[in-house]
């Protein structure tokens, strides 16, 4: 049987039990937060660190709190700065239900953006647990944030650093129904045999699993507090199951959230206009968010160059070690409006963010 067969699942269960025990400890001992600036250590708390979350003074049941998980890498940092710039631009505009904002930093230590962006510092998973798949830290970071931070709003928008808000976002959720973007590559029916390991038949038809990830999603705070620890444990279990890990690859954590939402009976209103992903989506007119996950490569006549390095290009992966320069060259005539808007909005943000290239 070997080490894997004899000891693998006991070790996994021990780790999951440790995380659940820690989560339950946090729930039972939820201390009030001191009113300090985001990221400041409490002088009287010894080894404990508490963080405040800035929220607006107005309070309505329809406000949502925007939460963005991130690391302290240069790659993540510049995207967070652009994202936060556009959040601030639209937060108080007519039609907005946008409340407070938190960057959930799961690197385990404060970084250079603590005074620029409201930030909660979360502990990462123990070394080696993520197996190089860093987004496994996301659900564990949400568990910590939901239980340690004081969040005034009744709803949460889970977003990502590479999201640009293009207009005020209303609360798209309705009652107990969350609101989410449907991803074409999340296919529960296709992978039913794999998903049944985590969503048994007694939980209902596989169609109860929505074709979503955890972002963008607007969900009630109370529902997310129930979903998050399940999302954490399902993510770990999926990553440690070779068949599931191979089937889902880099979208594994997205499937884990979709399963966890279904396990807790939280259905989602699917909004295809919630977000667009250039260059494949060509217009921004109806959308709320640009997700620049794909590279944009075009020739100088405006024709897309699929699978090739473009004569003109924008790809966030080109800026892993340093932020993009100010005043990026705009795309040539004929390139989709969504790509032009993306680059224009990045240029506006970088022109107005102090000390950008530092």
Curated annotation (Swiss-Prot):
It comes from the Eukaryota. Disruption phenotype: No visible phenotype. Short-root-hair phenotype. Hpat1 hpat2 double mutants have longer hypocotyls, are early flowering and show early senescence in leaves associated with a decrease in chlorophyll content. Hpat1 hpat2 hpat3 triple mutants fail to produce detectable levels of Hyp-arabinosides, have low fertility and shorter pollen tubes. One of its GO terms (molecular function) is hydroxyproline O-arabinosyltransferase activity. Keywords: Glycosyltransferase, Golgi apparatus, Membrane, Signal-anchor, Transferase, Transmembrane, Transmembrane helix. It catalyses: trans-4-hydroxy-L-prolyl-[protein] + UDP-beta-L-arabinofuranose = O-(beta-L-arabinofuranosyl)-trans-4-hydroxy-L-prolyl-[protein] + UDP + H(+). InterPro entries: HPAT-like, HPAT/SRGT1-like. It is found in: Golgi apparatus, cis-Golgi network membrane. Glycosyltransferase involved in the O-arabinosylation of several proteins including extensins and small signaling peptides. Catalyzes the transfer of the initial L-arabinose to the hydroxyl group of Hyp residues. Contributes redundantly with HPAT1 and HPAT3 to arabinosylation of EXT3. This is Hydroxyproline O-arabinosyltransferase 2. It comes from Arabidopsis thaliana.
